[in-house]
Amino acid sequence: MVNLTRIYTRTGDKGTTALGDMSRTAKTDLRISAYADANEANAAIGTAIALGSLPEDVVKVLVRVQNDLFDVGADLCTPVVENPEYPPLRVEQFYVDKLEADCDRFNAELEKLRSFILPGGTPGAALLHQACTVVRRAERSTWAALEVHGEVMNPLTATYLNRLSDLLFILARTANKEIGDVLWVPGGERG
């Protein structure tokens, strides 16, 4: 369990921060961007839960995802090394498998897509669409970090984020199930 007695430490006041293994790196390191974006995604999901009046089964999945995103952040901030002194928290395939099962379960209850969807509809759907775009950015940040630091990073973190963006899109559609999706009308058809 984490025990924080003080929030500020002053150790980052010169532009560096500690990774999970206590090594120091620049705050501009791509790994820092990746887990910062994952943290922002978690906040966006929390906003959707708090303000979105979402169905209980959706909220239950999102709360699990919020916990998963802390695991993703812990994984991203801890370099992969052989024989670590303490076994770090790592995203494993079963995290992705759970997301895929959720995607399949919720998508089975939706009408088939016949057009692109505009972000909007109910407040909950709009907030989930926004969270989806933040997760997509977190995924891109993670892939960028993997290009540079791939030998010390777990690529399943990026796979998890990729699948999570799919799930959030499906959950946004679920939040709009009663009123229907807001469909894109191509330029020539808008009049």
Which residue ranges define each predicted feature?
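Phosphate/pyrophosphate-binding loop motifs in nucleotide- or prenyl diphosphate-using proteins
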Residues: 1-191
